[in-house]
């Protein structure tokens, strides 16, 4: 197969969903039927191939996205299995950035759950074409049609139903293919490997006709010629329908909806056919955004084997046998082991050593990889998540990933001096793997503080520290990661002078600080940032080589705010004027001046304390509703909605994280263990003044 053709045959897909929707089981079945796995792994037995970290097998949840390659028909499918737990949304975000398409798995009983919404919005952000697989159709209470309605109501999506279930709950035995207008039935005893087509059951004919008509109404809109044919009463062929479904899926005009039961081995092969038929190849995506290093210009780069090499590092993982592995998605060109490339973000050269194709935790050495491939590189020295690897002669930086601020933190103290050294190494390795995990030192207490996206996230980090790095540590109680911001525009003109014999220091900076939400001409790429720096220096008042010193100084000093020492976020700093000295000025002098300007200027911006607000969803039987709402209100909660779901009620509320510690026990006692909740980070908001006073006093 020529390299150009090869691109058409690749599908880079992610499988993502809410925790427990059956995502890992679906991936396991895909690996089984594509011949990569000889024994089906069951998540609840701790044997799933994709869940290869010890903690994952114990907890039955997927934490890191394992990448794996398999084949179906004549296509190569690279699958990334992503975690569904809210504490690991960063893993999902990283995966979506490098995927061309996704399969969103939904629980046929629960429908669209909070984490499904989060993943869906993340996929929207990266314009990832996707299709939906309504799983667990064999379970009691499964309702395919309600799930389809929830896709419309909750996600605002346009579902295109291309399959209907045959039988419900324990009688679920197959699907109706609305393209071929045939029923596909699985033999129970053959582990799903044997299935056959038959005529649509008589009692489902009307329903199938109704949904077939809806399908045709939606797809013919994409092609005038086919629409004319359809309106004049001519038959639209299966080939034409497939072509239009593919066109509509790639352009996100609609999302094909399929159904099945991965656990019962039903519906997986048609899902694979749909991945191949409807999800895009790298060629369909066509371009990737980035910047040409030599000119600084933003450009669209074609995805092609013949272009110079460019790849994005999207994951770092420690492999017990190979050491550090960097997963990359190659967008253009090709590499062979032994080549030297450049990390354009860090401006460091990297030599490509071992190159591996991964199958969950098995690996296959390859000598060459090209555009469209997802491979793991062993032993890179300076590359971290989000960096670009590029051809040395034609350097590009691909669009970077933005990572969310951590919302929870806790102190860790090593139990012995030996643990102290090991802990430093362990934490820096774990932080390199996971950009949503941060490590810092509290300057007042000297304690090491770790920060993450939730209690489970930090629990697993600590667990890995113990298991993989053999570090014993004492763990403090979880703390809320407060932030600070300014609420009005302020300006500061600061001069830093130091003369004590020998070379002196001189730097003058004039900086305007303003809240991000008040910046009128904010660029699109700056809208999701927490700190924006801009220089408006004209006429060389501050030479170009000193300006990075100002940005670096501000970026460092904003980590310790002016109210209670929490990081300062959501503001823009504009350098508008300054002065320098031919001999005494330096990058360091401007860095010091910027820090002092921040310390003096920020208090004039009416600074406020911010706290993380979580979106909490509680599912409860009717009889406990009153008590639960009363309790949520007492936690400074704001109820957003109340909806019936089956014979339960779903309450959605925005609640400060500070009020949610230990909520699981309260909810258990309020509902006699019958209610459940999930929690997701929503936004940062100002802390009420009486609460802010208590927080400041504790500092």
Swiss-Prot record:
GO molecular function per UniProt: GTP binding; GTPase activity; translation elongation factor activity
Record's Gene3D superfamilies?
3.30.230.10, 3.30.70.240, Elongation Factor G (Translational Gtpase), domain 3, P-loop containing nucleotide triphosphate hydrolases, Translation factors
Q: Which residues form the tr-type G domain?
A: 8-283
Q: Tell me the CDD domains matching this sequence.
A: EF-G, EFG_III, EFG_mtEFG1_IV, EFG_mtEFG_C, EFG_mtEFG_II
Q: Does the keyword GTP-binding apply?
A: yes
An example Pfam family from this entry, by short name, is EFG_IV
InterPro entries tied to this protein? EF-G-like_DII, EFG_II, EFG_III, EFG_III/V, EFG_IV, EFG_V, EFG_V-like, G_TR_CS
> Known SMART domains for this protein?
EFG_C (SM00838), EFG_IV (SM00889)
Top-level taxon of origin: Bacteria
Q: Where in the cell is it found?
A: Cytoplasm
Give me the residues that bind GTP, please: 17-24, 81-85, 135-138
Q: Specify whether ATP-binding is a keyword of the entry.
A: no
GO CC aspect terms: cytoplasm
| SUPFAM superfamilies, sorted | EF-G C-terminal domain-like, P-loop containing nucleoside triphosphate hydrolases, Ribosomal protein S5 domain 2-like, Translation proteins
Q: Which family does it belong to?
A: Belongs to the TRAFAC class translation factor GTPase superfamily. Classic translation factor GTPase family. EF-G/EF-2 subfamily.
Q: What is this protein called?
A: Elongation factor G
- The protein's organism comes out as Rickettsia peacockii (strain Rustic)
Query: What lineage is this protein's organism placed in?
Result: Bacteria, Pseudomonadati, Pseudomonadota, Alphaproteobacteria, Rickettsiales
């Amino acid at each position: 197969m020529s390299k150009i053709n090869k691109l058409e045959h690749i599908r880079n897909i992610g499988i993502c969903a809410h925790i427990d929707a059956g995502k890992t089981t679906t991936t396991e079945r895909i690996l089984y039927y594509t011949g990569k796995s000889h024994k089906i792994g069951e998540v609840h037995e701790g044997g799933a191939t994709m869940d290869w970290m010890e903690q994952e097998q114990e907890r039955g949840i997927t934490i890191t996205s394992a990448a794996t390659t398999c084949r179906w028909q004549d296509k190569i499918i690279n699958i990334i299995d992503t975690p569904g737990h809210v504490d690991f949304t960063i893993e999902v975000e990283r995966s979506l950035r490098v995927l061309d398409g996704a399969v969103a798995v939904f629980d046929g009983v629960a429908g669209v759950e909070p984490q499904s919404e989060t993943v869906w919005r993340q996929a929207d952000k990266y314009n990832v074409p996707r299709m939906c697989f309504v799983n667990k159709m064999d379970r009691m209470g499964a309702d395919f049609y309600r799930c389809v309605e929830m896709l419309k109501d909750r996600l605002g999506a346009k579902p295109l139903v291309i399959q209907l279930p045959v039988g419900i709950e324990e009688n679920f035995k197959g699907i109706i293919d609305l393209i071929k207008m045939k029923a596909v039935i699985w033999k129970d005893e053959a582990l799903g490997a044997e299935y056959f087509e038959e005529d649509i059951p008589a009692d489902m004919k009307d329903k199938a006709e109704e949904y077939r008509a809806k399908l045709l109404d939606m797809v013919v809109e994409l092609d005038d010629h086919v629409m004319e044919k359809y309106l004049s009463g001519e038959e639209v062929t299966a080939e034409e329908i497939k072509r239009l479904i593919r066109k509509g899926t790639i352009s996100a005009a609609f999302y094909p909806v399929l159904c099945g039961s991965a656990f019962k081995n039903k519906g997986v092969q048609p899902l694979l056919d749909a991945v191949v038929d409807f999800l895009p190849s790298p060629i369909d995506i066509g371009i990737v955004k980035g910047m040409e290093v030599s000119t600084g210009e933003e450009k669209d780069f074609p995805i092609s084997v013949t272009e110079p090499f460019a790849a994005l590092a999207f994951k770092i993982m420690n492999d017990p046998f190979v050491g550090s592995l960097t997963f990359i998605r190659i967008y253009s060109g090709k590499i062979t082991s032994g080549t030297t490339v450049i990390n354009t973000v860090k401006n460091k050269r990297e030599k490509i050593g071992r190159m591996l194709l991964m199958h969950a935790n098995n690996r296959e050495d390859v000598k060459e990889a090209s555009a469209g491939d997802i491979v793991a590189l062993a032993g890179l020295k300076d590359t971290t998540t989000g960096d670009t690897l590029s051809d040395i002669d034609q350097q590009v930086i691909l669009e970077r990933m933005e990572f969310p601020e951590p919302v929870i933190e806790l102190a860790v103290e090593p139990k012995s001096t030996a643990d102290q050294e090991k802990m430093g190494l362990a934490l820096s390795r774990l932080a390199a793997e996971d950009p949503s995990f941060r490590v810092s030192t509290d300057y007042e207490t000297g304690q090491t503080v770790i920060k993450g996206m939730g209690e489970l996230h930090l629990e697993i980090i600590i667990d890995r520290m113990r298991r993989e790095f053999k570090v014993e540590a004492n763990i403090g109680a979880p703390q809320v990661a407060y932030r600070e911001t300014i609420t009005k525009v302020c300006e500061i003109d600061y001069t830093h002078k130091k003369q004590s014999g020998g070379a002196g220091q001189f730097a003058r900076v004039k900086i305007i600080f303003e809240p991000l939400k008040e910046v009128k001409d904010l660029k699109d790429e700056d809208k999701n940032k927490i700190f924006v720096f801009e220089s408006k220096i004209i006429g060389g008042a501050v030479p170009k080589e000193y300006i990075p010193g100002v940005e670096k100084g501000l970026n460092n000093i904003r980590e310790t705010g002016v109210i209670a020492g929490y990081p300062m976020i959501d503001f823009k700093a504009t350098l508008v004027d300054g002065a320098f000295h031919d001999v005494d000025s330096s990058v360091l002098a401007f860095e010091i001046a910027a820090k002092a300007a921040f310390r003096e200027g920020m208090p004039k911006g009416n600074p406020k304390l911010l706290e993380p607000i979580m979106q909490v969803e509680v599912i409860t039987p009717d009889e406990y509703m009153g008590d639960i709402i009363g309790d949520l209100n007492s936690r400074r909660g704001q109820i957003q909605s109340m909806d019936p779901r089956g014979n339960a009620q779903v309450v959605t509320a925005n609640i400060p994280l500070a009020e949610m510690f230990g909520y699981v026990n309260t909810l258990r006692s309020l509902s006699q263990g019958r209610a459940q909740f999930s929690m997701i980070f929503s936004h940062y908001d100002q802390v009420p003044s009486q609460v802010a006073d208590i927080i400041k006093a504790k500092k």
